[in-house]
Structure formats: structure tokens, C-alpha cells
A protein has these predicted regions:
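Glycine-rich phosphate-binding loops of nucleotide-dependent enzymes
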Residues: 1-347
Length: 347
């Protein structure tokens, strides 16, 4: 199984892992490919670690105590004392605000998917959105970004206190929004095109003269982002389909950073990415907010939200059901917010 829990919430992941252990007791052998170390440690009897196409370590979990730190060291080729880069937040005034945002289902107009959500983010702030699968996080992000999801969308979006038009993706981009999709292969990249072409895709005017693409400018821009984001490739002519998951994700982020957004919305930014590349992506995220921009981060990995965000909203069933400052947040408190709202809905 290749990344079997990548799109599952914690409860469903737990059920799948329990099923694997039950199958093991029945004599069934399972091979799991995963970046989630806690899951591998829970179910694996042995672990083979692959880096750059080669097997670099073999761990027998039945004969030795295997720690996550040891796995990480083998994966990245060095010790990693911290999973997240040190941050010195410099949070300013409100930069981005959404008020009373409502979205109906695209095929069932009577069904409201997003129910009067109001959120904001300040300059230099990373704001997380936590929630279970199906809570409406991705639908919220897509509906804000050019109304690319849903029908009968209403509410107000503002940047720097001024209402902006997000009625199309082009208008959303022109007004300072960018959205990194949760599905980079399906919607984030042209896999048969080069790093260069993908980097410039959302901002062709930035590398064109009178509607004609300037190849030198396009190549120069792609090389700048390749160097800045440490994209590992032969050159910028390499097809993105031949890159690792982490490097593909960096290309997607490059594409949107080239549009110079004020607000960067990241939907599952490290899904299917190894530990070393995750750290590099976290560093990129921190660099973006250090420039005075803000980031909205949607993630199913609570440790990621707790490790990177300054503030966390909690969503459930299309509503905001909780809000925490980083210093007050933990996994238990977030889950309590979700479960409490679920109980209220059922009463």
C-alpha cells in the first residue's frame, strides 16, 4: 500500500492500521510505503529506509528499539534536532479578512457547505485551519480563491481593509491571493511540462513582452526559484513528473510565489513529502511571513499545525467551532472543540 492514510483523518487511519494488525495475525503480509513515522512505528515489524533511490538502512523492530529520530536521520542523512524551524513571529495589523462567508453545494443548492464563516490573518502570521476530513476546509479555500468551488457564494473578502473581487481565479490572483492545492499532481502541476513552464504558469505577464514570452526571463525566473527553494533537479528544463514529491511541491509553491501574493493559502502543504523536504517547506513558509505576508495553512497533521502556526481555527461541518493561540493549543483541545460541536449538532 502506497501512502494508504494520506487522505484519511486520524480516526479512519487508526481503523486501517488496526485492520492491518488483524490481517497480520491471520498470516497476511503487508508492505506499506509511508512518510508518517508514527504509523510505520506502530505496525511495522521491519523498516527499510530509501533515500535517493537506494536502500540506506534496515531496522528490525522485533529485535531493537526503533525511534523516530533514528528513522529521520536515515531518511535525511543527518541528525534533525528540531522538526520545525525556529520562528520569531513579527505579527502586525490585519491583512486578510473573510466575513460571513457562505457557500452552497455545487450540485445541491439547498445544501449549505460553508455556513457563515468569518476569519482573519495578520501581517507576518501563519493561521492554521484544523478539522476532520469533510469539515469543509478545502471547500472554504477554493471558494475564496476565485469561487472555484460551490454555488450562490456570498460574503466579503478584504485585503488591507479593502474589499476585493474574487469572482474569478484571475481576479483573485490579481488582488493578491494564491492557493496551493492539496492535489499537486491533479491540479497543481503540468507533469509533462518543465519546471520552467510550471513556475511561470500563473504569471505569464511577468515573463512576457507584448504577449510574447521572453524565454530568457522565464528561464532566469525559474532558476532563481530553483535556487531559492532548493529544488533538486538537473536543470529547469526537467519535467516536473520526474521530480520527487517534495521537489514537485516546491515547484507548485514557486509558481504561486512568482505571483507575489499578499495571502498564500496552503492546502495540505506537506502531503506525501519526506521529513527532510518538509523541514525545507516549513522554512520557505516562515520566509514568506517574514516578508510581511500572511499564510492560511490547512493540514490534517495536527503536529504540523501546532509546530508552525501562530493561531489555529477549528472547523467542523462547515463552521468555525474553535480558535486557539499557539501557546494555548494542543491536540486534545482541538479535538474537544470538534467533538463538542458534533454533540451539539446531534442534539
Amino acid at each position: 500500500m502506497d501512502e494508504p492514510t494520506a487522505s484519511l483523518n486520524d480516526n479512519d487511519s487508526d481503523r486501517l492500521l488496526t485492520l492491518l494488525l488483524e490481517l497480520k495475525a491471520q498470516g497476511v503480509t503487508s508492505i506499506i510505503i509511508s512518510h508518517k513515522l508514527n504509523e510505520i512505528s506502530r505496525v511495522a515489524d521491519s523498516i527499510t529506509i530509501i533515500r535517493d533511490g537506494s536502500s540506506v538502512d534496515y531496522l528490525n523492530c522485533r529485535e531493537e528499539d526503533v525511534s523516530e529520530d533514528r528513522i529521520i536521520k536515515a531518511m535525511v542523512g543527518r541528525d534533525m534536532e528540531d522538526r520545525y524551524p525556529p520562528r520569531m513571529p513579527n505579527i502586525g495589523e490585519i491583512l486578510f479578512e473573510v466575513k460571513d462567508w457562505r457557500v452552497d453545494h455545487p450540485n445541491h443548492a439547498a445544501r449549505e457547505i460553508i455556513k457563515g464563516i468569518s476569519i482573519n490573518a495578520r501581517k507576518g502570521e501563519i493561521v492554521g485551519i484544523a478539522g476532520l476530513m469533510g469539515s469543509g476546509r478545502t471547500e472554504l479555500a477554493m471558494s475564496i480563491f476565485g469561487k472555484s468551488y460551490g454555488k450562490n457564494i456570498r460574503g466579503n473578502v478584504s485585503i488591507h481593509g479593502k474589499s476585493i473581487d474574487v469572482s474569478t481565479v484571475r481576479k483573485a490572483i490579481d488582488n493578491g491571493l494564491a492557493y496551493v492545492t492539496e492535489d499537486r499532481k491533479g491540479y497543481g502541476l503540468l507533469l509533462e511540462e518543465s519546471i520552467k513552464k510550471n513556475t511561470s504558469l500563473a504569471n505569464l505577464s511577468g515573463i512576457s513582452n507584448k504577449l510574447v514570452v521572453n524565454d530568457y526571463r522565464e528561464t532566469h525566473t525559474a532558476n532563481e526559484f530553483r535556487s531559492k527553494l532548493r529544488i533538486r533537479s538537473a536543470d529547469v528544463e526537467q519535467h516536473t513528473g520526474n521530480l520527487s514529491g517534495g521537489n514537485q511541491q516546491k515547484v507548485v509553491i514557486s509558481k504561486w510565489l512568482f505571483t507575489a501574493p499578499d495571502v498564500l493559502i496552503l492546502d495540505e502543504p506537506t502531503r506525501g513529502v519526506d521529513v527532510g523536504a518538509k523541514y525545507e517547506i516549513y522554512t520557505i513558509i516562515d520566509q514568506v511571513v517574514q516578508e510581511g505576508k500572511c499564510i492560511i495553512m490547512i493540514s490534517s497533521e495536527m503536529p504540523e499545525l501546532l509546530g508552525m502556526c501562530d493561531r489555529i481555527y477549528v472547523m467542523n461541518e462547515g463552521k468555525i467551532v474553535g480558535e486557539f493561540l499557539a501557546k494555548d493549543a494542543n491536540q486534545e483541545a482541538i479535538m474537544r472543540s470538534i467533538m463538542k460541536n458534533g454533540e451539539n449538532e446531534n442534539e
